[in-house]
Amino acid sequence: LMFFKLIHRSSKSNARAGKIFTDRGVIRTPIFMPVGTLGTVKGVHQKELNDNIKAQIILSNTYHLFLRPGIDVLLDSGGIHKFINWNKPILTDSGGYQVFSLSNNFKIKQEGVYFSSHIDGSKHLFSPESVIKTQNIIGSDICMVLDECLPYPCDYSYAKTSLNLTHNWLDRSIIEFNKKNKAYDYNQFLFPIVQGGTFKDLREKSAEYVSEKQMAGNAIGGLSVGEPKEIIYNNVDIVCNILPMDRPRYLMGVGTPENILECISLGVDMFDCVMPSRNGRNGMLFTSEGSINIKNKKWERDFSPIDSKLGYMSSYYSKACLLYTSPSPRD
């Protein structure tokens, strides 16, 4: 079963073009995945996401879906695709990052992560096995292993201990995944995650360990928690020079246009980030000429389009129109 085909490699950088094959469609890479935390991308209708934005795949979050609507509802609905009426591929992250960033309190143990829901305080355990089972019920096309996402900065001793735990969790995740307890009749693919903080030897060790597993694709985690861009690029370069050429590489959570273009040149194929939708809701827009704050008063009589180079929606509304129709604190 072919999952990834490398179509072209740049002669000027490590950029490449390829295709990912899933039961729900082909994904052309490099690809940016809009984030739909609960399945749907905030502020965007599914038809617009498909027809205008032309999203080939979206990302949903295991932590949030586990808490609401819950796996029983998703199972009864026939999985996330039917629940949100989306017939293209979906990737789910493991939920580990959200446990560490959103939970009121959490404890990392060998067996997994104990945490309290940020919604109602209820207590739960995410183990490598339970996270695979949950994503199986969610029904995503690509699922992720549970890992520990380190803060930045982080000392070497803790990063080394954490990496050993993450690798142990990876092995357990693969064992559970290989049981093939599919909830639905289509293929699901598992990506391991390279961690190691910002330490070259740990990143190399993790990239080598992950590569040995020969999974369908590989992810690079822990580089969207506040690191300077030079550190991001350096670590991505280190990892991409080790990960196998014939598997897609997914850089988790990194999503400014500048970051994406630079990391494509380093050999990354897949990206996700909440930034486009979150920033858009708050008036910050990415254009082909840089980012603009549409709530700035200087746009109040600017009747030119947001960006005439970026398709229908960007050329349809003027800057002045968006300034006056954007939500403000008093609305």
Predicted regions and their residues:
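Glycine-rich phosphate/ribose-binding loops and adjacent secondary-structure elements
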Residues: 176, 180, 188-306
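Cys/His-rich short segments
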Residues: 307-315
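Hydrophobic alpha-helical segments that mediate membrane insertion or helix-helix packing
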Residues: 93, 135, 210, 262-263, ...
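Non-catalytic, usually N-terminal nucleic-acid engagement modules in DNA/RNA processing proteins
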Residues: 2-184, 292, 296-300
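Conserved small/polar residues in nucleotide/adenosyl-binding loops
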Residues: 324-331
